[in-house]
Amino acid sequence: MKRFINDMEKYYRYAVYSAKAELKAEVAGSYLNWIWWILEPFCMMLIYAFIFGFVFDAREKYFTAFIYVGLTLWTFFNQNMKNSVRMVKKNKSIISKVYLPKFILIESKMMVNGFKMLVSFGIVIILMIFYQIPLSWNVFYAIPILICMWIVNFGLMTILVHFGVYVEDLANVVNIVLRFIFYLTGIMFSIEHRIGAKHPELALFLEKFNPMAFLISSMRKCLLYGERPELLGIVSWIGIGIVLTALGIHTIYKNENSY
């Protein structure tokens, strides 16, 4: 772990530089530039709000904001998982010429997706003002929730980065699994109210053992409903994320010469 910390300090500036370069490259050839980072999830929010609000008659409180919070966090997680599978192969031209810890590639990509997520949170603030959602001190729990999500994402990505080198079809498998998890995470509905009404054991299982379901639900509680999230759950997932990170970093260091 000491080597990991030293390498993170040594190559952190590269991660920041790489993230900035990627963000600039994304908007360079676009007429709307960075506005797409807001426009895309906003349009998806409107689509899901129409389908589940009017067609399926979902009626969660502050429904539009409810969906957008879920989509914002899910997009961060979804993009990170998809990007990590082919990360080493995609950056083969760089890592074959100079030594670069593979987890620095992960950190750089997370910075890119994290910046987009923070931009999207601007819409969340606007929606909170629109709905006149009363603020409480519980909104500050959003910070440990985001830290927890970052650690869990990083840990999962270190593992996917390794196996993505050797398993050619892993990207297809990950896409299918992510689509399945999407519908079990409660992006467009409340797991507690919708699933819990008929299957309380399943709802409890999903909220306890699906990290994104737990984190999205926790974020909604502190931002939209003025409630305190389950602190033990946040601490537990931070611990799990640290364990995943330790396993992933150990695996990367052990096999990096064969990548």
Protein language model annotation of sequence segments:
Residues 1-259:
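Hydrophobic transmembrane alpha-helices and immediately adjacent juxtamembrane helices
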